[in-house]
Amino acid sequence: MNENGLSYIDLFAGAGGLSEGFIQSGYRPIAHVEMNEYASQTIETRIAYYYLKGNGKIKSYYEYQKGQITRKQLLELIPKEELKTVINKEMSEATIKGIFNAIDDIKEEKGVNQVDVIIGGP
């Protein structure tokens, strides 16, 4: 999945459509910033999909799709470091410093020195 090793941040991420294309092209997501709670939850679900698929545990994702496990049970299978890449906050003067700090923390935890691309929805 990480063929080219390039990293990105997704601003105004929505439900993650742009991220889907970047992930499928081998980019590594650093953070997804989205103010809508439900769109952020969709991104978390996609993170779960890619994590489980990449770790040979895709069966758990299919169990979730079939209603055999709850969303909470699904997300408990995913490392917190992966899920915290979803920053569910509105970007404003009041929140921007906290968002930058959260992104810096994620970069440090992932050992990322630079972000290669910043993408954003309309």
Where are these regions (language model features)?
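Conserved active-site and SAM-binding loop architecture
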Residues: 1-122
